[in-house]
């Protein structure tokens, strides 16, 4: 039931995105993320799992964290200023956004089969990717639309995002086995810095938090 609420939230987010209401699309992505969190927590507390639940969860996640942010990027690419050389491709280039949905599905399929990801992640989790795109487009959309130079940069970011989703970069999870500092240094550093970024930058801060998460994960993995 909770998984279906996540799926419905994703469908609503897609609808808002395609109509150009990106703030409401982000709101429904966040609502879907909350349903996804409580769904997983409930399953762990009750010690229940099933094959159909696992498949439904992945389907819901791809809609909420794959198709919805892709639809937001699609809308942004339809209204951005294009460099003159790319203007003839305006009817076609926005559809590149939907590779985000495809790579999100691939990332979720890998996650279901990868036994290494029980206490941490390998590759960028789809909720983090969705929140990055949602907050970036809502918080900095007007800036992105101001100059044609941002349009190809956005396409490059889409490709980087797709790579991160299926990469082999280890990324930490906010799962605490105990609450002490020792062994949780990276998690506490992330949470403290994230709180500061959110206080300073509000919605745009979410994108900065995700960027910080990627950097900190990659840096930690390189040191270990």
Question: What is the predicted role of each segment?
Answer:
Residues 2-5, 25-32, 96-103, 129, ...:
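Hydrophobic alpha-helical transmembrane segments of polytopic
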Residues 39-50, 111-115, 119, 173, ...:
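Cytosolic, membrane-interface loops and tails of multi-pass inner-membrane proteins
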Residues 118-224:
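C-terminal membrane-associated helical module and adjoining short loops/tails
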Residues 11-14, 31, 69, 102-105, ...:
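Alpha-helical transmembrane segments of polytopic integral membrane proteins
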Residues 1-4, 45-109:
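Multi-pass membrane catalytic core of lipid/isoprenoid biosynthesis enzymes
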Residues 8, 34, 38-42, 59, ...:
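Active-site His/Glu-centered metal-binding helix of metallohydrolases
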Residues 12-27, 69-95, 136-153, 200-203:
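Helix-coil boundary and interhelical linker segments in multi-pass alpha-helical membrane proteins
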Residues 1-37, 198, 208-209, 220:
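Topogenic membrane-insertion module of multi-pass membrane proteins
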């Amino acid at each position: 039931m909770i998984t279906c609420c996540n799926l419905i939230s994703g469908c609503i987010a897609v609808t808002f995105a395609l109509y150009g209401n990106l703030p409401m699309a982000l709101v429904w992505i966040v609502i879907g993320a909350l349903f996804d969190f409580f769904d997983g927590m409930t399953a762990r507390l009750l010690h229940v799992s099933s094959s159909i639940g696992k498949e439904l969860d992945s389907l819901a996640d791809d809609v909420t964290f794959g198709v919805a942010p892709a639809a937001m990027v699609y809308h942004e690419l339809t209204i951005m200023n294009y460099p003159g050389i790319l203007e003839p491709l305006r009817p076609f280039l926005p559809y590149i956004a939907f590779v985000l949905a495809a790579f999100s599905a691939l990332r979720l399929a890998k996650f279901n089969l990868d036994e290494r990801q029980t206490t941490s992640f390998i590759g960028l989790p789809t909720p983090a990717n969705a929140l990055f795109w949602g907050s970036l487009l809502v918080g900095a959309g007007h800036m992105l639309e101001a100059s044609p130079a941002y349009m190809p940069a956005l396409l490059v970011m889409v490709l980087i995002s797709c790579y991160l989703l299926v990469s082999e970069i280890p990324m930490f999870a906010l799962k605490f086995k105990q609450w002490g500092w020792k062994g949780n240094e990276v998690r506490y550093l992330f949470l403290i810095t994230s709180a500061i970024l959110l206080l300073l930058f509000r919605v745009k801060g979410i994108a900065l938090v995700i960027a910080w998460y990627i950097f900190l994960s990659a840096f930690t993995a390189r040191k270990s």
